[in-house]
């Protein structure tokens, strides 16, 4: 059954005059509060992404171990092979490459003989053996903690360091900066933070400062590299 809308009742028109409405003043306008504009972020890209694998894996393998001086972090500071550089150094990054170390995770001399390297975490460099098969063989041999650990090698020009200052052009040398897993975390942090800065318009820096800091974890002390704009 359809419902019909009731019609409004008709009232007898009254002779009284309608009330006069008194206009009220418009409320005062409250000024709008605008927030300061934040710097716009463009397309984000990790800093130094274009430097990954500039030096090809086959070239890295052909160079072999120890071809260039190796910069590492020690409790006393940065080391270049056996030479002390001090707490800081300035470098120009040419390339950075992933390197996986397949290790028994044991400190005895015999275990050190079984350490292998892979650049893709699939095959052992120099032999072509499967990384997973090699780890399984190490565990079968009694090294229960055998595993693959990710490292990074940075190939760079060393242009200055704390103990000597700025190097003359003829003194600048190419070095292999070896990042431990702890230093690698700091490198990734730098890539993220600097990538944001560059997406906001900051110029890409040519040089980077490497600083060695002393760290402690689970009673173990070690040196760690940190990265900043030179």
Question: What positions do the PLM features span?
Answer:
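Short nucleic-acid-contacting surface segments enriched for D/E, G, S/T with interspersed K/R
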Residues: 187-209
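OB-fold ssDNA-binding interfaces and closely related basic DNA-contact patches used
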Residues: 2-167, 217-229
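Short Gly/Pro-enriched loop/turn and capping motifs at secondary-structure junctions
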Residues: 184, 215-217
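Short acidic, glycine/tyrosine-flanked loop/strand segments centered on an H-E-D-like triad
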Residues: 154-194
């Amino acid at each position: 059954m359809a419902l019909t809308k009731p019609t409004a009742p008709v009232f007898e028109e009254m002779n009284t005059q309608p009330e006069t409405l008194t206009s009220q003043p418009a409320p005062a306008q409250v000024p709008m509060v605008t927030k300061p504009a934040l710097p716009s972020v463009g397309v984000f890209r990790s800093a130094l992404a274009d430097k990954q694998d500039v030096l090809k894996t086959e070239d890295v393998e052909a160079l072999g171990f120890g071809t260039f001086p190796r910069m590492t972090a020690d409790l006393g500071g940065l080391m270049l092979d056996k030479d002390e550089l001090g707490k800081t150094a300035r470098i120009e990054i040419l390339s950075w490459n992933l390197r996986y170390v397949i290790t028994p995770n044991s400190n005895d001399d015999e275990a050190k003989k079984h350490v292998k390297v892979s650049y893709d975490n699939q095959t052992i460099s120099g032999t072509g053996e499967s990384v997973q098969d090699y780890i399984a063989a190490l565990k079968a041999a009694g090294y229960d903690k055998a595993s693959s650990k990710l490292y990074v090698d940075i190939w760079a020009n060393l242009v200055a360091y704390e103990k000597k200052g700025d190097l003359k052009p003829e003194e600048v040398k190419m070095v292999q900066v070896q990042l431990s897993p702890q230093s690698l975390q700091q490198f990734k942090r730098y890539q993220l933070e600097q990538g944001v800065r560059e997406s906001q318009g900051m110029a890409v820096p040519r040089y980077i400062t490497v600083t060695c800091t002393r760290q402690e974890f689970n009673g173990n002390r070690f040196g760690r590299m940190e990265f900043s704009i030179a």
